[in-house]
């Protein structure tokens, strides 16, 4: 296993999976070339990829960061009545949080020619596909937190529709859009667009 190739594959997988889950878009084509059917460029794939490029990837993910022990002030009367469980022995010594944090050494992101890990070309900054909603650098930070804010911005036309469609699919066996991972031009059209919009907003 070539460590850099492994890392690049996992970052690409996170990018593709996030795109399908949150936006209902199949962007994997844009890893090697501009998307053939949807208006997503090769550069836009790697701009989205750059949000995940600074996550530490060690191959073996250790247990999370230990959470600090809470410090609370509780009156004696509280412990005798409503909070009697406070006097019970702790069931866990430590609580771990599974948090993926940014790498300490930030790496630059490059467009990879034909998606190959060993063929970097031009540098790109974190951005999202313009066709969905342009990434406003004054409104969002250029990390995964900023990306999450972008996903849940009320102006984003896809996140809520994709989520509602998946919930509908769980209840009724088929989504309002029958291709839940593809809201792009090759996916199915919603059988009731007004219902999808109404449920999403």
Roles of regions detected by a PLM:
Residues 1-78:
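Sequence context surrounding c-type heme c attachment/ligation sites in exported
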């Amino acid at each position: 296993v070539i460590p850099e190739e492994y890392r690049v594959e996992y970052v690409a997988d996170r990018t593709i999976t996030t795109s399908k889950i949150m936006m209902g878009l199949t962007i994997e084509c844009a890893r090697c070339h501009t998307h053939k059917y949807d208006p997503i460029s090769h550069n836009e794939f790697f701009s989205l990829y750059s949000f995940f490029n600074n996550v530490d990837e060690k191959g073996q993910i250790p247990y999370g960061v230990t959470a600090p022990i809470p410090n609370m002030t509780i009156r004696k009367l509280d412990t005798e009545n409503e909070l009697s469980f406070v006097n019970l022995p702790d069931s866990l010594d430590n609580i771990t949080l599974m948090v993926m944090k940014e790498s300490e050494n930030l790496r630059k992101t490059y467009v990879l020619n034909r998606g190959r890990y060993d063929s970097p070309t031009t540098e790109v900054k974190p951005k999202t596909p313009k066709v969905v909603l342009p990434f406003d650098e004054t409104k969002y930070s250029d990390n995964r937190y900023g990306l999450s804010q972008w996903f849940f911005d009320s102006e984003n036309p896809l996140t809520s529709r994709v989520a509602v469609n998946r919930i509908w699919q769980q209840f009724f066996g088929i989504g309002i859009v029958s291709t839940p991972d593809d809201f792009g031009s090759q996916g199915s059209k919603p059988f009731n667009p007004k219902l999808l919009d109404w449920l999403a907003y």
